[in-house]
Amino acid sequence: MAVSSCQSIMSNSMTNISSRSRVNQFTNIPSVYIPTLRRNVSLKVRSMAEGEPKEQSKVAVDPTTPTASTPTPQPAYTRPPKMSTKFSDLMAFSGPAPERINGRLAMIGFVAAMGVEIAKGQGLSEQLSGGGVAWFLGTSVLLSLASLIPFFQGVSVESKSKSIMSSDAEFWNGRIAMLGLVALAFTEFVKGTSLV
């Protein structure tokens, strides 16, 4: 609609402009339908202030000394608060570490569980009972410490985020892997055998 009206305006040449005063020159619509902008000549503006206007006292200001009434300029850019490196802050319920660590462990655990299940045909419960608990605990401690070291140095996950390997992608992949592990365990429990 807007394109066609612009094209019709542009296609009309200046020679086709009519000299009629009751018709809009560009759209050929009678001016009865288009609101006009008329000036109200009788409009007067007056002040509603009470009393006499007060004159400001003139005080000589020395240009070398700053006045007390001038505000101090605030910097335009303020740094974000630095991330806390205390263990209790990192591992708090809303801290940066717990969900990252659990997500990373779930990603490794889901891939490892599915790999063993495809290769050997063992379910998740068989993997844990056949010596998998020691591997699980060792891997969990190692990856948890490896995830905590950058946090203790004050490095946030978002500062090291890149376009493809972004922190949001890791966050969502970890959540999906956690759901995948729970779904794998639940499916094997209901089914009674391994998934594959």
Curated annotation (Swiss-Prot):
Family: Belongs to the ELIP/psbS family.
Induction text: By light.
Keywords, ordered alphabetically: Chloroplast, Membrane, Plastid, Transit peptide, Transmembrane, Transmembrane helix
Residue ranges of the TM segments: 105-125, 132-152, 176-196
GO cellular component, as recorded: chloroplast membrane
UniProt biased composition (Basic and acidic residues): 47-57
Name of the protein in question: Early light-induced protein, chloroplastic
Membrane topology: Multi-pass membrane protein
Region feature Disordered, mapped onto this chain: 47-81
Span of chain positions assigned to the transit peptide in the UniProt entry: 1-48
Family annotation (Pfam families): Chloroa_b-bind
Compartment list: Plastid, Chloroplast membrane
Organism: Pisum sativum (Garden pea)
